[in-house]
Amino acid sequence: MKILVAMSGGVDSTVTAYKLKNLGHEVIGCYMKLHGKPNYHEENIKKVEKVANFLQIPYHILDLQEDFKNKVYMPFVDTYKEGKTPNPCALCNRFIKLGKLLEFAKNLGCEKLATGHYARLENNLIKTAVDESKDQSYFLASADKEALKYLIFPLGEMKKEDVKKFASTIEVLKSFATQKESSEICFVEDTYVQVLDQFMDTKIPGEVLDSSGKVVGKHEGYMHYTIGKRRGFEVRGTHEPHFVLKINPKQNQIIVGTKEELKISEFNLKNINLFIDAKELDCEVKIRYRSKSTPCKVEIYEDKSAKITLKDPVYGLASGQMAVFYNHDKVIASGFIE
């Protein structure tokens, strides 16, 4: 089978390419240039070239910087401007890795696209990885349903430690087993505020309000805060911990309250991405990558919006983040929180 492998220069994509080549497939590597971080690509391309030479496979360098800027980077900035919390990895998977890269794979005549994600596929549904600590099904849940039939995730049945051990047994790949893992958001060096600083003044002080609308303190600029944050702002007249409940970007205000006030039992989604045919779902939902799943009921409307009712309340639901719905270990839907 002719397979395009997304190669980043990391251990996961390297072992993915190695495994597929060893199974006798016709493997082609592809490195994506997504952003202009200095020296970032040069180092990674050297690693990809080293692996490609070792495996004796051709590789391509695909410049997707413009697409990435329009579909991932600027939406990241704009979402924070709106006082919401973005999910750039979900957008990147949908539009870039499982969008533009898949399109490139088809143009090369490849039957499949393989990535180093920790996830599995079963009956055209994304399934959680064997290694639960590294499972990436949450981020892949934004994928277009039609893309799934072209995908392969060779590491889905492996534990991360076994992937590293496997790489360390092969002389040429030993260095890949010990290299530092990449950060979750590839274009953020230290903090997301450093990215926002390039586009706006993030340090304009504003008012802190309680849930009744009373001014109780000051903050250092609304973009420094996300829902649930409990530090970095002033609250006068109380010793009880306070958390960010809401952000008003136009007024440069943050509304804070007690942990009890963070509780939410219902929320809405826009543009639900369904992997099964349904008008209602009785399932479990994850409201952020590292959160535990919570039982819920989902009502889906004609305009693809949805209302979610949780069995147990959750704390700190952030608008802009992705909610991912599971039936046991399979992803059945996803959508962005209103």
Curated annotation (Swiss-Prot):
It catalyses: S-sulfanyl-L-cysteinyl-[protein] + uridine(34) in tRNA + AH2 + ATP = 2-thiouridine(34) in tRNA + L-cysteinyl-[protein] + A + AMP + diphosphate + H(+). One of its GO terms (biological process) is tRNA wobble position uridine thiolation. Disulfide bonds join C92-C186. The record marks H117, Q321 as: Interaction with tRNA. Residues 134-136, 288-289 are annotated as: Interaction with tRNA. GO terms for cellular component: cytoplasm. The active site is at C92, C186. ATP binds at A6, M7, S8, G9, G10, V11, D12, S13, M32, G116. InterPro entries: MnmA-like, MnmA-like_C, MnmA-like_central, MnmA-like_central_sf, Rossmann-like_a/b/a_fold. PANTHER family: MITOCHONDRIAL TRNA-SPECIFIC 2-THIOURIDYLASE 1 (PTHR11933:SF5), TRNA 5-METHYLAMINOMETHYL-2-THIOURIDYLATE -METHYLTRANSFERASE (PTHR11933). HAMAP family: tRNA_thiouridyl_MnmA. Belongs to the MnmA/TRMU family. Catalyzes the 2-thiolation of uridine at the wobble position (U34) of tRNA, leading to the formation of s(2)U34. This is tRNA-specific 2-thiouridylase MnmA. The lineage of its organism: Bacteria, Pseudomonadati, Campylobacterota, Epsilonproteobacteria, Campylobacterales.
